[in-house]
A protein has these predicted regions:
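A general structural signal for short secondary-structure boundary/capping elements
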Residues: 43-44, 67-69
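Nucleotide/phosphate-binding catalytic cleft detector across ATP-hydrolyzing
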Residues: 1-61, 77-189
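Short beta-strand scaffold segments in enzyme catalytic cores
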Residues: 62, 69-74
Length: 189
């Protein structure tokens, strides 16, 4: 998603550790994870999240709250695809840029649906709006696939939304990093 950042990281590892960096999507992970989508169109962060949760017996929906809000569907050891929605902070920034009278707001969880001022109304709209988006997408995946899933939240705003679903949700803060480490251990066997 951020090629310039990846390029800087790649150069850093080459300069200071004399080693090459590879993206997960470009590595042979076929015995670890079956990828059922076009590899060129999936982010390595999403693959890392999938690798982190695979256990050959459970189905997972991983919701990653980052620049985008990603929903990834993993069945047993297969990455089946997902959903990409706009990230909350990105959407907030865009709203204040495009609507000059809307202030730039630091997102906070709202307990009241009806806001009493602009800031509380924005927080309410984003909290309840994204809660509905998350709930609807997860239920739509379940309905369409006719499977049961364990739900994992990760990323910066994961804890804020944990209790906004009726389904049981587990928070895994280091999911992406754990997936990269799991892939590295697999590749270095």
């Amino acid at each position: 998603v951020v090629p310039n950042c990846y390029k800087k990281i790649k150069n850093y590892f080459k300069l200071y550790f004399n080693t090459n960096c590879n993206e997960l999507k470009n590595l042979n992970l076929s015995k670890l994870l079956s990828i059922k989508v076009n590899r060129k169109q999936i982010g390595s962060d999403r693959l890392a999240n999938a690798i982190s949760v695979i256990d050959n017996k459970n189905n997972y929906i991983v919701v990653d709250f980052g620049t985008a809000t990603n929903f990834d569907v993993i069945s047993a050891n297969s990455y089946n695809g997902g959903v990409i929605a706009p990230g909350i902070n990105l959407s907030l920034e865009n709203l204040s840029k495009k609507a000059s009278l809307i202030p730039n707001v630091k997102f906070k969880k709202s307990n009241n649906v009806v806001g009493k001022n602009t800031i509380s109304a924005i927080n309410s709209g984003f909290f309840f709006g994204y809660s509905g988006l998350i709930d609807n997408i997860i239920h739509s995946i379940i309905k369409q696939t006719k499977k049961k899933y364990k739900i994992i939240f990760t990323g910066g705003l994961a804890k804020m939304f944990k209790n906004s679903l009726k389904l049981r949700v587990k928070i895994k803060s280091n999911l992406t990093t754990d997936g990269v480490l799991k892939a590295a251990m697999y590749l270095n066997k």
